[in-house]
C-alpha cells in the first residue's frame, strides 16, 4: 500500500487517480515538502528564501525516519496481573521518573504519560 501511495504522489495531487484510494490509507515513511525537502516529526520545513537553509548548502538535511511516536504505537499492550502498575521507562539513566498507573478505570488501558507505553490488567 505504501508503494502505491508513493507512486500516486508522483502522478499529481487531486487527480482522478488519487480519488480511488481508501479513506483510511496511511502514508508510511518520510514526508517531503513541495520543494523536495524532508519534513521532520515536528513538521519543520523551510521556505526557499529562508536564511536558515544555509546550514544545508551542498548536502541534504538528515532526518531520522523512525519517529518515536510511531515506534511506541507499534508496541503491544502489556498484560499485567495487578491493578496498579509502576512504569520507570526502563530504569537507570535511560528511563524517566517512576509513575504509578491505576488500571481499574473506565478506560481499562493505562498509558504512561512519559514514554507512552500501555498496560492492561489481565483478569484471572
Curated annotation (Swiss-Prot):
Membrane topology, as annotated: Peripheral membrane protein
Subunit structure: Mammalian complex I is composed of 45 different subunits. This is a component of the iron-sulfur (IP) fragment of the enzyme.
Keywords, ordered alphabetically: Electron transport, Membrane, Mitochondrion, Mitochondrion inner membrane, Respiratory chain, Transit peptide, Transport
Family assignment from sequence similarity: Belongs to the complex I NDUFS6 subunit family.
Name of protein: NADH dehydrogenase [ubiquinone] iron-sulfur protein 6, mitochondrial
Domain of life: Eukaryota
Compartment annotation: Mitochondrion inner membrane
Gene Ontology terms: biological process: mitochondrial electron transport, NADH to ubiquinone
Claim: Thylakoid is one of the keywords in the record: no
Function: Accessory subunit of the mitochondrial membrane respiratory chain NADH dehydrogenase (Complex I), that is believed not to be involved in catalysis. Complex I functions in the transfer of electrons from NADH to the respiratory chain. The immediate electron acceptor for the enzyme is believed to be ubiquinone.
Example of a GO cellular component annotation carried by this entry: mitochondrion
PANTHER family: NADH DEHYDROGENASE [UBIQUINONE] IRON-SULFUR PROTEIN 6, MITOCHONDRIAL (PTHR13156:SF0), NADH-UBIQUINONE OXIDOREDUCTASE 13 KD-A SUBUNIT (PTHR13156)
Disulfide pattern: none
Extent of the transit peptide: 1-28
A Pfam match: zf-CHCC
InterPro entries reported for this sequence: NDUFS6 (IPR016668), Znf_CHCC (IPR019401)
Source species: Bos taurus (Bovine)
